[in-house]
Amino acid sequence: MQEAYVNINSIPTHIFTWGRWIEETITEKEIVICITGNPGLPGFYTEFAGTLQKELGDLPVWVIGHAGHDDPPEASIREVPQLSGNEELFNLDGQIRHKIAFIEKYVPSDVKIHLIGHSIGAWMILQLLENERIRSRIQKCYMLFPTVERMMESPNGWVFTKVAMPLYSVFGYIFFSFFNFLPVWLRLMLIQIYFLIFSIPRQFLGTALKYSKPSVAEKVVFLADDEMARVRGIQREIVEQNLDLLKFYYGTTDGWVPISYYDQLKKDYPKVDAQLDTKKIDHAFVLRHSQPMAVIVRDMIQQHRRV
């Protein structure tokens, strides 16, 4: 595994790679790129992506998070712009431009991309397919637990808009500022207690600590709020025009994407390649189900390799 912060659209962006670094010459004719969900900290995806690359063996796997969701170390000379006055860098449109810039800079035009999108990453993939320069490079898109429609109407969307956002608007900045005022050891201990309660592996402690920074949390919430406003009905024209490129994977216990969304997709597009999970994998699969999900995605990719 290799990792570094690289400037994409003038924003320091944390990139993780397995098999080949982004600045190395790519000799393979295919590559796997994973666009994260929200929060877009690629550190949550290390077990998933590492397992996937090991299972595939010969394909590089890269993970890119979202602009502003993972600040460089304090000693770094690179700084992420503040949210205020730079909203266009961190909303959905800004995140899409961010992904286009990354692909165009680091992926050679003759290399085909197996593009994984988790949660809102799947919605971003639909927007990327509108860009012919990107679309022409794609081998297949794997839409995992895809929040591509009616986010606000979902059970979790209702909780976010009716409960979480009002609370964050009043107490969010104060809470995160106070939390970050605490000594690091105490912050880690509190996060570890939370992890124990919800059975989250300790390996994500460092990533969760980054997530708790006020400058990161506000951008995560800002993007989520934009998702609620923008992700409404499914984008029928994009889906219809790209059915051959899309593979959907839906959960059965997903508060963001109820099974009814899967049923409606199958009804509206009888020929769509959509699969319903049988292993009770969570929406946030990277926290507890990285390895089984990596095996599932491996099988998907193997079916759609270039001949």
Swiss-Prot record:
<dbReference type="GO" id="GO:0045928">
    <property type="term" value="P:negative regulation of juvenile hormone metabolic process"/>
</dbReference>
<feature type="transmembrane region" description="Helical">
    <location>
        <begin position="166"/>
        <end position="186"/>
    </location>
</feature>
<comment type="function">
    <text>Probable serine lipid hydrolase associated with lipid droplets. Appears to lack or have very low cholesterol esterase activity. Appears to lack triglyceride lipase activity. Involved in cholesterol and triglyceride homeostasis; stimulates cellular triglyceride accumulation and cellular cholesterol release. Involved in negatively regulating juvenile hormone (JH) and possibly, insulin signaling activities such as triacylglycerols (TAG) storage, and thereby plays a role in the endocrine regulation of organismal growth and survival.</text>
</comment>
<dbReference type="GO" id="GO:0012505">
    <property type="term" value="C:endomembrane system"/>
</dbReference>
<dbReference type="GO" id="GO:0005789">
    <property type="term" value="C:endoplasmic reticulum membrane"/>
</dbReference>
<keyword id="KW-0472">Membrane</keyword>
<feature type="active site" description="Charge relay system">
    <location>
        <position position="254"/>
    </location>
</feature>
<dbReference type="InterPro" id="IPR019363">
    <property type="entry name" value="LDAH"/>
</dbReference>
<keyword id="KW-0551">Lipid droplet</keyword>
<dbReference type="InterPro" id="IPR029058">
    <property type="entry name" value="AB_hydrolase_fold"/>
</dbReference>
<feature type="transmembrane region" description="Helical">
    <location>
        <begin position="188"/>
        <end position="208"/>
    </location>
</feature>
<keyword id="KW-0378">Hydrolase</keyword>
<dbReference type="GO" id="GO:0019915">
    <property type="term" value="P:lipid storage"/>
</dbReference>
<feature type="active site" description="Nucleophile">
    <location>
        <position position="119"/>
    </location>
</feature>
<dbReference type="GO" id="GO:0016298">
    <property type="term" value="F:lipase activity"/>
</dbReference>
<dbReference type="GO" id="GO:0005811">
    <property type="term" value="C:lipid droplet"/>
</dbReference>
<dbReference type="GO" id="GO:0034389">
    <property type="term" value="P:lipid droplet organization"/>
</dbReference>
<keyword id="KW-0256">Endoplasmic reticulum</keyword>
<keyword id="KW-1133">Transmembrane helix</keyword>
<feature type="active site" description="Charge relay system">
    <location>
        <position position="283"/>
    </location>
</feature>
<comment type="subunit">
    <text>Interacts with the juvenile hormone hydrolase enzymes Jheh1 and Jheh2. Also interacts with Hmu, Cpr, Gp93 and Pvr.</text>
</comment>
<dbReference type="GO" id="GO:0017171">
    <property type="term" value="F:serine hydrolase activity"/>
</dbReference>
<dbReference type="Pfam" id="PF10230">
    <property type="entry name" value="LIDHydrolase"/>
</dbReference>
<protein>
    <recommendedName>
        <fullName>Lipid droplet-associated hydrolase</fullName>
        <ecNumber>3.1.1.13</ecNumber>
    </recommendedName>
</protein>
<dbReference type="GO" id="GO:0030730">
    <property type="term" value="P:triglyceride storage"/>
</dbReference>
<dbReference type="GO" id="GO:0010883">
    <property type="term" value="P:regulation of lipid storage"/>
</dbReference>
<comment type="similarity">
    <text>Belongs to the AB hydrolase superfamily. LDAH family.</text>
</comment>
<dbReference type="GO" id="GO:0005783">
    <property type="term" value="C:endoplasmic reticulum"/>
</dbReference>
<feature type="region of interest" description="Potential amphipathic helix required for binding to lipid droplets">
    <location>
        <begin position="157"/>
        <end position="200"/>
    </location>
</feature>
<keyword id="KW-0812">Transmembrane</keyword>
